[in-house]
């Protein structure tokens, strides 16, 4: 009753209708795919440790989207370990529950999705400044670590960092109160191979590839 220990069960299901005009039926088919089928188990232990486990059965495959534990030791110091969203893309960090459309915008494909690693973050300056620094296996732009079977295929790792400010959080103006300014970046130095080039390809919401590296 005090919220120190709790478990929540919920989920999200998204269906997408893909009907394309003048397309090559050998390349793309008109279809109703289940893009997300995600039962979610999350909770809190001891009022400090939060956990989340999210399998995904959408798109005809089984993937573990989230599997992490967060220690909320202090509002300014929280530690997350496991598989979680890299602290980079703004839209990517939004929950699938809160999206206005089933598919995210193209710029989100330029940022990594979920990865395995360790993250330190928190809120500073009366919660007006959020920060996060993560040490990760490394994943392609727009992709998650399951691209490589949720294992690292080399010794090189990736750093990701993010700062996001709410300078007018206490303003009387509704428009200013919701204004946020942020910056995020990643750094890695990894060499691919012919079998694993470590280069992403980019697709439209209809899953038609419109760009790939050579």
Role assignments for model-derived ranges:
Residues 2-141, 147-191:
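Outer membrane beta-barrel
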Residues 174-214:
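Detector for outer-membrane/organellar transmembrane beta-barrel domains
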């Amino acid at each position: 009753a005090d919220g120190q220990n709790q478990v929540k069960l919920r989920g999200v299901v998204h269906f997408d209708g893909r009907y394309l005009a003048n397309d090559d039926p050998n390349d793309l088919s008109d279809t109703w795919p289940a893009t997300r089928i995600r039962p979610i188990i999350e909770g809190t232990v001891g009022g400090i440790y939060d956990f989340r486990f999210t399998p995904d059965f959408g798109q005809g495959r089984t993937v573990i989207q989230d599997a992490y534990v967060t220690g909320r030791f202090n509002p300014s110091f929280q530690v997350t370990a496991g598989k979680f969203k890299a602290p980079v893309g703004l839209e990517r960090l939004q929950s699938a529950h809160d999206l206005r459309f089933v598919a995210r915008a193209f710029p989100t494909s330029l940022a990594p999705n979920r990865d395995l690693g360790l993250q330190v973050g928190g809120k500073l300056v009366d919660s007006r400044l959020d920060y996060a620094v993560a040490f990760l296996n490394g994943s392609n732009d727009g992709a998650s670590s399951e691209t490589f079977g949720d294992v690292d295929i080399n010794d090189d790792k990736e750093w990701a960092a993010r700062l996001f400010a709410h300078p007018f959080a206490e303003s009387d103006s509704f428009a200013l109160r919701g204004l946020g300014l942020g910056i995020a970046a990643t750094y890695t130095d990894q060499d691919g191979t012919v079998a694993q080039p470590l280069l992403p390809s980019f697709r439209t919401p209809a899953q038609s590839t419109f760009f790939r590296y050579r």
